């Protein structure tokens, strides 16, 4: 008998009065709101306009949901198109199954459309929302807890997650507790968000480098949690497909960090970028100050004015 363990919820449905709501969907919605809130604070702290982050998010989220679902279905086709699969269930997003890589890839397309409409560069937007995205992932992982899915190998550790017999793998029906990989990844993602906010205050992480830092840091943790998972997945050379994806994406993110730092040192002046066009670029060579991190509110008029005066001096010289 296990003396200590983490229990699983008895149901995956929350009731808001008479309205039933899938807990998985609720976690996603809550994560989106958190991402918009934090992204807006960072954008405004750098001189950006209120509402821009929310407007662009209205484009990014639908694209991201479609991309995340497509990635999940394409990488786990047997569950929907196999011998016992039900193709129509590929549309049941509320039951769980969103691949982060597909969500980021197609979500970026939606964000690009939104950024074009507001005439701002996509990298500047991505840098602003990077810690919010990983915070949203931390919240969204709790949807897996409600669904009793994507857990890890059996374990006898005190924090092992108890899984109902109906949700256990066929080969381990008599084993009750498993690694709570949802919790591991959620805690890791909170740490990544904190790392980004800290780094943004101390280094000039502009031109997409903040977003690249998020991707690189996230993939390290994802590789570890993916290694513990036991749900069915395609493998290559002994590693799950998502492990290989993590390795490739990590290398790409590190390359982006290095190349961007060499070609575009400094950070964009968001106040001047708005309205200058999606291809406009104005750099501030100084490291980002505290206002680029988790600022307490909108900036005063002094920050944009100092940046403009500095730009004028450089042009007169």
From Swiss-Prot:
Pfam families for the chain: LGT
Residues holding a 1,2-diacyl-sn-glycero-3-phospho-(1'-sn-glycerol): 141
Subcellular location: Cell membrane
GO CC annotation, single: plasma membrane
InterPro entries: Lgt (IPR001640)
UniProt enzyme class: transferase
GO molecular function: phosphatidylglycerol-prolipoprotein diacylglyceryl transferase activity
Transmembrane segments: 19-39, 51-71, 93-113, 120-140, 180-200, 211-230, 241-261
Disulfide-linked positions: none
Record GO biological process: lipoprotein biosynthetic process
Protein name per UniProt: Phosphatidylglycerol--prolipoprotein diacylglyceryl transferase 2
Species of provenance: Streptomyces coelicolor (strain ATCC BAA-471 / A3(2) / M145)
